[in-house]
Amino acid sequence: MIPAYVPNSAAALFGGGTPIDLGRTFSDGRRVFGDGKTYRGFFGGVVSGVLVGLIEIWAATAFSLSALPQQTFLSVTLLATGALLGDLAKSFLKRRLGKDRGESWFLADQYDLVVGSFLLILIFDPQWLFGTITLPIAVWIVVMTPLLHRVVNIIGYYIGVKEVPW
């Protein structure tokens, strides 16, 4: 899951520039995603997640770290991309519900990356998903994701990368 946890933070670091929705509005008159979702942030986040995943693959082999999941280039790419696609889907829904950029949305803010990652990997690499994500790992993901999300966002807020600490 590490390749899925990295992209959101990296997107905040690399963000800025052209919004993915190019400033367009949806049929409800609201922005599709908003200014917070940019091409630079999206691709910077995905590349960062993939690079961390490749380091994980190398470390697992080089240091015989059997506790790490058996990752592949495909799995780390799907996890990283799915995390940010989940974030985009959440932003789309937030705009439809009239929520502002940065406004907290309990549970959706914490689990969008998990849902996006798992959905993408379920579609393109279900063998990896069912062979790697056991019940104890799934429980760990459900419990730890909101905690990690909160800690990382607080750090991002204090170093000036995020406008709000959630």
Curated annotation (Swiss-Prot):
It is an enzyme of class 2 (transferase). It is found in: Cell membrane. Pfam families: CarS-like (PF01864). It comes from the Archaea. Keywords: Cell membrane, Lipid biosynthesis, Lipid metabolism, Magnesium, Membrane, Phospholipid biosynthesis, Phospholipid metabolism, Transferase, Transmembrane, Transmembrane helix. It is a multi-pass membrane protein. It catalyses: 2,3-bis-O-(geranylgeranyl)-sn-glycerol 1-phosphate + CTP + H(+) = CDP-2,3-bis-O-(geranylgeranyl)-sn-glycerol + diphosphate. GO terms for biological process: glycerophospholipid biosynthetic process. Pathway: Membrane lipid metabolism; glycerophospholipid metabolism. InterPro entries: CarS, CarS_archaea. GO terms for cellular component: plasma membrane. The keyword Transmembrane applies. Catalyzes the formation of CDP-2,3-bis-(O-geranylgeranyl)-sn-glycerol (CDP-archaeol) from 2,3-bis-(O-geranylgeranyl)-sn-glycerol 1-phosphate (DGGGP) and CTP. This reaction is the third ether-bond-formation step in the biosynthesis of archaeal membrane lipids. Belongs to the CDP-archaeol synthase family. This is CDP-archaeol synthase.
